[in-house]
């Protein structure tokens, strides 16, 4: 089996075309390919790829349960919790399950051994197939606030080989870090607008802090100005491809279709993107090997 290669598709904000790039890139790639939707708060890759989902696995995190007969109300558990998920009020312990990260610090800190843990469901990991693609997605339970553990569960379910196209959450917050930190390459999708440039800079700062190699895809490349291109040149960031502002792409999107199947010529753009990513990762691997 070929060595696994994870390509994360990310963006500094929502609405730039991140999922459009992810599903179309996955569709044109050859060989063993897995599409992983880690935008667990609102996964939508399935709308376009239309997988037959045949497996679902519930995911939860351990949250504290306090035995009132053993609890002395000392407050050690609340002092130990850096996430403010547990509080001691008038010697009564209150647990806020939606804030809990499941670290177990309160259990360790309790001198009376009054705290145990129970599983708190946060969502489900679903998997199946779409034509030649393996498909995995996480779906956060409605009302649940803790997405990183579910994202990690999606990552743990990935195959050990082949290419993985990882559709990351938008933005630069904790869920994004959880999704992209183990990637071999990150594609940042942006658009040539002031908002697009502002959020691209935040995304670039994030991936640089993580030490991840990356490049940029400019979506709707002919709607704005040259400031995104100027910024990428100044920062020596490779622009992998530019995608035109084509009404046919938007129409295909609105119908839930993969754009490369609906717009002649677009397949070549995404095949070029695949080739550019391969070239970048091959060069990086060669540099690592010579270090």
Regions found by a protein language model. Name each.
Residues 206-291:
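C-terminal lobe/tail of nucleotide-utilizing enzymes
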Residues 33, 164, 186-187:
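Short, well-ordered beta-strand core segments
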Residues 32-46, 119-124:
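Short beta-strand-centered segment that lines the nucleotide-binding/catalytic pocket of NTP-utilizing
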Residues 175-194, 200:
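Inter-motif core of Ras-like GTPase G domains
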Residues 39, 137-142, 146, 151-176:
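Switch II (G3) loop of P-loop NTPases
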Residues 2-30:
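Walker A (P-loop) phosphate-binding motif
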Residues 43-62, 127-129:
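P-loop NTPase switch/communication element
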Residues 65-84, 94-113:
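Cysteine-centered iron-sulfur cluster-binding motifs in ferredoxin-type domains/subunits
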């Amino acid at each position: 089996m070929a060595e696994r290669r994870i390509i994360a598709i990310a963006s500094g904000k929502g609405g730039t075309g991140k999922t459009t790039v992810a599903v179309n890139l996955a569709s044109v790639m050859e060989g063993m390919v897995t599409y992983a939707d880690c935008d667990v708060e609102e996964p939508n890759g399935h709308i376009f790829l239309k997988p037959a989902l045949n497996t679902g696995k519930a995911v939860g995190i351990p949250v504290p349960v306090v035995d009132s007969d053993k609890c002395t109300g000392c407050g050690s558990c609340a002092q130990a919790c850096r996430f403010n998920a547990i509080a001691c009020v008038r010697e009564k312990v209150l647990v806020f399950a939606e804030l809990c990260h499941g670290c177990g610090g309160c259990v360790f800190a309790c001198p009376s051994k009054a705290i145990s843990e129970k599983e708190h469901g946060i969502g489900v990991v679903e998997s199946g197939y779409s034509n030649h693609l393996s498909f995995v997605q996480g779906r956060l339970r409605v009302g649940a606030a803790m997405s990183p553990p579910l994202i990690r569960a999606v990552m743990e379910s990935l195959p050990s080989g082949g290419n993985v196209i990882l559709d990351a959450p938008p933005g630069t917050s904790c869920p994004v870090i959880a999704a992209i930190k183990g990637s071999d390459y990150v594609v940042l999708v942006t658009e040539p607008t002031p908002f697009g440039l502002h959020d691209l800079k935040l995304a670039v700062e994030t991936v640089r802090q993580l030490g991840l190699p990356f490049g940029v895809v400019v979506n709707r490349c002919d709607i704005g100005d040259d400031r995104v291109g100027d910024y990428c040149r100044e920062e020596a960031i490779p622009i992998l491809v530019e995608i035109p502002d084509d009404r046919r792409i938007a129409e295909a999107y609105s119908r839930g279709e993969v754009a490369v199947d609906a717009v002649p010529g677009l397949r070549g753009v995404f095949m070029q993107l695949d080739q550019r990513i391969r070239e970048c990762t091959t060069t990086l691997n060669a540099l690592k090997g010579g270090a």
